[in-house]
Amino acid sequence: RRDLAVLAKGRRVLDVCTYTGGFALHAAAGGAASVTGVDLDEKAIATAKRNAKLNQVKARFVQADGFHYLRQLSNQDERPEVLILDPPKFARDRNEKEEGMRRYRDLNRLGLEALAEDGLLLTCSCSGVVSEDDLLDALRNAAARANREVTVFRFSGPAPDHPMALHAPETRYLKALWARVRKL
């Protein structure tokens, strides 16, 4: 989140699936030109607003479905220059993986279409059954469908307080891809 604050400085930031505003608040504290956080959960949005007030940062929080919000945004002139996609777990187990991957592909496609030219994307997954390679495949598919050139410049994972058990690779459930995005 601290790294995001540096990248967000002076830019318009959209945090989709913001939950309680963690990424959005760091972007605002880092000097983003504007910050909007979107989440479907009414209580999470109320908490995000309280967190912004407690941290004395300016951020706008909207209760909305992230997929729908991104669809509407793709028709707007002023698009985010930095986009964070940090959805809840789309696949809880192997039986849900195919549907979860479809949702990751769709969310990333909508995000890429909504992002400003030469934008930055941080896309995340907290699904243990979705590997880093799976997330890369979803982003690759989304980029092709959105007609975007996506250059991943960083892979990141869990902090030391989220250890991985060697016998259970799904315990390495947090993963994130950082990318630059251009229209083809």
Can you annotate each of these PLM segments?
Residues 20-33:
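Conserved SAM-binding loop of SAM-dependent methyltransferases across substrates and taxa
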Residues 10-17:
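Conserved class I S-adenosyl-L-methionine
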Residues 17-21, 126:
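Class I SAM-dependent methyltransferase "Motif I" SAM/SAH-binding loop
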